[in-house]
């Protein structure tokens, strides 16, 4: 079977150019969202807002061995997306292990509103699955805290 001219794969240079352009467009979309959020969080940190509000959330976050300020990253990740969570986490003074722990927990439970709605629209029980994801993220956080306490990681 012979391949016609319309069915041919575009030349490699054209594919690379297209990929680079699409990559830059994606990066610029992310920067437009993440950079302002990062600046706001950094300003809130500089003026003590994060510390004050973080103290209020500290009891909950201490269950996972995390500072109270990380609660805002979890809220941003749950309500918006992971890019918002990263923008909130970036200016915080976290250890590499704490960043990993937050990443695992948020990887399990992120964008809950939108994804819960999508699940519900497919006939699944979106609310139940959303609660399950939150519970699973909490269990993962506790397990990682335990690993750190045992000296296995972190």
Residue ranges and their predicted role:
Residues 51-110:
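Membrane-interfacial helix-loop connectors
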Residues 33, 37-40, 50, 82-85, ...:
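Alpha-helical transmembrane segments of polytopic integral membrane proteins
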Residues 40, 44, 88-89, 118-119:
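Hydrophobic alpha-helical interface/terminus motif in multipass membrane transporters
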Residues 3-76, 153-154:
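Membrane-embedded alpha-helical segments and adjacent helix-loop junctions characteristic
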Residues 87, 95-153:
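C-terminal transmembrane helix pair
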Residues 30-38, 78, 130-138, 142:
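Alpha-helical transmembrane spans of integral membrane proteins, capturing the lipid-embedded, hydrophobic core
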């Amino acid at each position: 079977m012979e391949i016609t001219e319309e069915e041919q794969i575009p030349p490699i240079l054209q594919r690379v150019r297209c990929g680079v352009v699409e990559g830059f467009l994606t990066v610029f979309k992310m920067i437009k969202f993440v950079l302002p959020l990062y600046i706001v969080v950094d300003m809130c940190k500089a003026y003590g807002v994060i510390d004050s509000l973080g103290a209020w959330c500290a009891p909950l976050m201490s269950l996972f061995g995390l500072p109270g300020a990380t609660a805002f990253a979890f809220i941003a990740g749950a309500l918006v997306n992971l890019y918002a969570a990263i923008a909130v986490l970036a200016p915080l003074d976290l250890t590499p292990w704490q960043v990993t722990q937050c990443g695992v927990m948020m990887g399990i439970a992120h964008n809950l509103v939108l994804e819960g709605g999508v699940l519900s629209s497919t006939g699944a029980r979106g609310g139940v699955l959303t609660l399950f994801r939150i519970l699973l993220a909490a269990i993962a956080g506790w397990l990682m805290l335990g690993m750190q306490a045992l000296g296995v990681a972190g």
